Amino acid sequence: MFLLYFRLGFQHILPLGADHVLFVVGLFLASTTLPALLWQVSAFTIAHAITLALATTGVVHVPPSIVEPLIAVSIAAIAVENLVERAFHWRRPLIVFGFGLLHGLGFGGALQALGLPPEDVLVALLGFNLGVEAGQVAVLASLALAVGWCQGAPWYRRRVVVPASAAIAVVGLYWAIQRLA
């Protein structure tokens, strides 16, 4: 049971979760140090674990018609912040925590759609959540291998962060409009 839901959680990120992948890419781009990245990823993880559990167990219900456009807006917002802020700021993990709450509602909706075994809700929830985390770690590791070597370069912001964040913002806004239609 655990492994089945772990796999489903991983697949919700890779290959099915382009929106969540872009959000994680946005976090990575603005994090030129490991501590900055860890603060943000930890805030995101804690937040989405909370709302994933609340949504999956039926304690909280927010319709996908509200959650999905807001997730897209969160992607655009984190990318725009990457364009505006030149350095890591203490409020960034708080913002990421708030956005993580939204993403957790999205994960919860996906998990509810898959169905939960009544006798193993906690095992399924834990497996799915850890699968999501493993997917995010895979994305971050891939990014570290691809561009981590140049994060300290003087041209990194101009040549990597700005164009990639601009593209992510455009995609996030497009998805928001598409999900509202």
Regions found by a protein language model. Name each.
Residues 1-181:
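Membrane metalloprotein/metal-transporter helix-bundle signature
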